[in-house]
Structures are given as C-alpha cells and as structure tokens.
Amino acid sequence: MELEVFAGQEKSELSMIEVARAILELRGRDHEMHFSDLVNEIQNYLGTSNSDIREALPLFYTELNFDGSFISLGDNKWGLRSWYGVDEIDEEIIALEENDDDEVAPKAKKKRVNAFMDGDSDAIDYNADDPEDEDAYEADPALSYDDENPDDEKNEVEAYDAEINEIAPDDLGEDVDLNEDDDEFSDDDAETSEE
C-alpha cells in the first residue's frame, strides 16, 4: 500500500498518528477500522518489526485518544472526527450500543447458600421470600401517591382532622375544627388569652 500524502518522505520519520490519519482518509467515511487492524496497516506501511510496534503501542493508543482528529466509535472502532457532524456522533455511538445490548444475554441470579441450614430440614429460609430480591417487583398502584389527584389530598386532610379530634381533650365536648383563615395571631388576641 502506498500513501500519496507521504510521497518523497522517509517512512522512518513518520509518526504512527500521521500514518493512521492518512490510512483512514484513504479508506473513507464508511470504512471505520478496528484498532488492531489499524495498527497492522500502520506496521505494514512503515515496515517495522513486531517488537518495535509493541513498544510504541501504548504511546500510539494514548495519542490516538488525545488527538482531536480521531474518534472512538465503540467496540474499539476508530474513525476520523471530520467524518461526523456533532449530532451524528451521538447517533453512531448509540446505534453501536443498541447492537451490543441485543447480543448480551441476561445474567442468571446466584443462589445464596446458607452453611448452617444444610442438614436441617425444619429450618426456615428467610432469604427465600425477600421481595427486594425480585427483579420484577411492581408497586401496588393503590399505595402510590399521585400529586395530580386532589382526592389524595382530601383523604390526607380528613385523616389528619380525625387524628386531631382523637387527641383533643374530652371536656371540649365538640369536634375541633381548624380555621385556616385565622393563621395570624395579633397582639389583641394575646391580651385576651392572658385574661
């Protein structure tokens, strides 16, 4: 493979980043490369030995990440940032992640073993019915509180009033009703209550 960009230059003077950029530009937008394939192409172009490539690999990977012209597309696939608009970058990465999610099988839950219960058939295993261990736990809709439902607030106020009436002294002889309009306490009220 010959890269016209480097015509007339010594291959030994080229950096791996420069060669990687040229290789990706030559391949084009829809031909992203896996990291290992990119390294193999660079090695073939530069004609370096396996030991030299292995020695330069950590620095090359670091430069690939820090150089602003490359972008990781997930799955260790690399492309040029100039190929993608800002919105497309997120779409490409999300599409790759969705493909990965389809391939991953759900993990099986590990069963806990209690060493003290092995020989005892009469023992009760309290871990067997723990509702927090269930993945498909659904809340009871009757127990949920809806901010939008005015009946919930009305029920709360009625329950609160009933509790206050239970606590009120019996010598009052009547239910205590709270008047929300009398929230302010004036000085005149203070004098009459002291007398």
UniProtKB/Swiss-Prot annotation:
GO terms for biological process: DNA-templated transcription; regulation of DNA-templated transcription. Residues 120-195 are annotated as: Disordered. Residues 14-83 form the HTH HARE-type domain. It holds the Pfam family HARE-HTH. Keywords: DNA-directed RNA polymerase, Nucleotidyltransferase, Transcription, Transferase. Residues 120-138, 145-195 have a biased composition (Acidic residues). GO terms for molecular function: DNA-directed RNA polymerase activity. Belongs to the RpoE family. This is Probable DNA-directed RNA polymerase subunit delta.
